[in-house]
Amino acid sequence: MYTINKNIIVINKPINWTSNDVVQKVKRIIKAKKVGHAGTLDPNASGILVLGINEGTKLLTKLTLDSKTYVAEIQFGISTNTYDSTGEIISKINKFITLTEIESAIENLYKNEYWQKPPKFSALKINGKKAYELARNNISFEIEPRLVKIFEYNILDFNYEKQILKIIIKVSKGFYVRSFAVDLAARINNLAHLLSLVRTESGQFSINDAIEIEQVYDYWNNINKHSTN
């Protein structure tokens, strides 16, 4: 297991937990004064969440987490208001696409940086309020697009009958895979939303460095016991 500091813990966030849920749970388990996280992970996603404990919170901004790697499943033919499977279905299209079309569209996005607009249902702050809170209350607002980049990708599977793509993708900081799914579909005149998402790498950390929430108590006691010897 890779670690740079005893006050940095890498958690394998369970699905249906918010990043803040994990922070508060860990804080209670180890009775820490302060716990923070680097890189929000959507509730519907699982995988790496890097935590700073007490003095470790000051290290979070210094960590090199400029790239993230995800394994994603994308459902074509259906769009939702959240860009993932938790949202309301907005539209459907009865148009099957091919793997060749998908590969061509990804290549066009892959070559250079491109402007990506984050989902309105996100934790980004708009005038001091979280975007998803505004979206849930049907308040009109706009999110500025940001420059993002795909560093690497590999198509793991494409089920033509179900129109589901499974892909591993390494991307820049601030990249939204939900937006990528929508942008990708738009380039081939289709619709899409994200079915599932697992973050397997965050900067220098990999999923192999992560521990389950149930392991936090023993891990914390063990690492602090050794550090005082």
UniProtKB/Swiss-Prot annotation:
Keyword Isomerase recorded: yes
Annotated EC: 5.4.99.25
Function comment: Responsible for synthesis of pseudouridine from uracil-55 in the psi GC loop of transfer RNAs.
Keyword ATP-binding: no
Residues of the active site: 42
Biological source species: Ureaplasma urealyticum serovar 10 (strain ATCC 33699 / Western)
Any one GO BP annotation for this protein: tRNA pseudouridine synthesis
Gene name of the encoded protein: truB
Family classification: Belongs to the pseudouridine synthase TruB family. Type 1 subfamily.
GO MF annotations, alphabetized: RNA binding; tRNA pseudouridine(55) synthase activity
Pfam families reported in the protein's UniProt record: TruB_N
Protein name: tRNA pseudouridine synthase B
Gene3D superfamilies: Pseudouridine synthase
Keywords: Isomerase, tRNA processing
Catalysed transformations (reactions): uridine(55) in tRNA = pseudouridine(55) in tRNA
